[in-house]
Amino acid sequence: MRVIASSIRKGNVLEQDGKLYVVLSAENIHPGKGTPVSQIEMRRISDGVKISERYKTTDQVEKATIEERNYSFLYEDGEGFHFMEPESFDQVQVTKDVVGNSAPYLQEGMVVKLSMHDTVAVAITLPQRATLEVVETEPVTKGQTASSSYKPAVLSNGVRTAVPPHVGVGTRIVVLTEDGSYVERAKD
């Protein structure tokens, strides 16, 4: 499907010269003089090479047809990450380039959305929140309940974050998968 360059957003998949590219960032630039342009940074899906393209905002580009489907995370090995479609039990392997910064938050059985082009996964969307255990932090200090200062902590997936003073080692907490920030104590 052909679209104008100014309508391209992060996460879109473009087809150019027979290859697929996932958009990492898209910015419309309107200089004081001259034609407005769209600056688009993309990663080639086949080999992970990053490129930067500049189009006039009115140029037509080819947007690939993408289908989003739910998959359950199974495991990770040297070849990549393995997911299974719950209804058909079809398994798909996803490269480390596609998973990217989401890797630490993947937990066995977690349901994620994979954006598929034919049979190739081009992007992954995690649930907004994940429940993890605090494995390392400073001891709980009595009387600091009114303080709004946070202390550093290491989670069970190895991610570092900041937690309130009342959270101790062994506490299960909910964090945002986008940036690893603390949301609340887990209710389980």
From Swiss-Prot:
* InterPro entries documented for this protein: Elong-fact-P_C, NA-bd_OB-fold, Rib_uL2_dom2, Transl_elong_fac_P/YeiP, Transl_elong_KOW-like, Transl_elong_P/YeiP_cen, Transl_elong_P/YeiP_CS, Transl_elongation_fac_P
Full protein name: Elongation factor P
Report any Pfam family annotated for this entry.
EFP
User: Which cell locations does it reside in?
Assistant: Cytoplasm
* Matches recorded under PROSITE patterns: EFP
Q: In which pathway does it act?
A: Protein biosynthesis; polypeptide chain elongation
Predominant location: cytoplasm
| MF (Gene Ontology) | translation elongation factor activity
Entry's transmembrane regions: none
Q: What does this protein do?
A: Involved in peptide bond synthesis. Stimulates efficient translation and peptide-bond synthesis on native or reconstituted 70S ribosomes in vitro. Probably functions indirectly by altering the affinity of the ribosome for aminoacyl-tRNA, thus increasing their reactivity as acceptors for peptidyl transferase.
Q: What are the UniProt keywords, alphabetically?
A: Cytoplasm, Elongation factor, Protein biosynthesis
Spell out the CDD domains in the cross-references.
S1_EF-P_repeat_1 (cd04470), S1_EF-P_repeat_2 (cd05794)
* Organism annotation: Rhodopseudomonas palustris (strain HaA2)
Record-level GO cellular component terms: cytoplasm
